[in-house]
Amino acid sequence: MESPLGSDLARLVRIWRALIDHRLKPLKLTQTHWITLHNICQLPPEQSQIQLAKAIGIEQPSLVRTLDQLEEKSLIIRHTCLNDRRAKRIKLTDNARPVINEVNRVISITRNEIFNGISNEETIFLNKIISKLEKNIINLHNKN
């Protein structure tokens, strides 16, 4: 019987995030917090809440509570978009820099440790397969 690849990949992501979560405990950030901060850094500056929610893969209402909490921690500020008063733009504060640097450091170290013993060629091959799977899934979504 074949291994359920989707379940295997989901489990891999879950335990990978749990490891990072454990290592970031001293920062007193929940998994949702550090994932949100990490995604804010990956996007161009002052993205809208809608764009951030899409990048993370969640609905915007689900993101609002997390952003409220990050704002309470003085890690982000939100302001109304000049072009669309309904939209909110997200900006990192100066307080967020050291936190994000530590989050990114832990993520990078953890990734390197996880990939220990895996060659660069194997990593490139894995990335190609993941990209193909993602493309196929997106194409299937677009058909429906």
From Swiss-Prot:
DNA-binding region(s) in UniProt: 49-72
Top-rank lineage group of the source organism: Bacteria
Any GO molecular function: DNA-binding transcription factor activity
Domain HTH marR-type: 2-135
Transmembrane segments: none
Tagged with keyword Repressor: yes
PROSITE patterns on file: HTH_MARR_1 (PS01117), HTH_MARR_2 (PS50995)
GO terms of biological process kind: response to stress
InterPro entries cross-referenced by the UniProt entry: HTH_MarR-typ, MarR/SlyA-like, Tscrpt_reg_MarR-type_CS, Tscrpt_reg_SlyA, WH-like_DNA-bd_sf, WH_DNA-bd_sf
Keywords for this protein: Activator, DNA-binding, Repressor, Transcription, Transcription regulation
Role of this protein: Transcription regulator that can specifically activate or repress expression of target genes.
The protein's assembly and partners: Homodimer.
Family classification: Belongs to the SlyA family.
Annotated protein name in UniProt: Transcriptional regulator SlyA
Gene: slyA
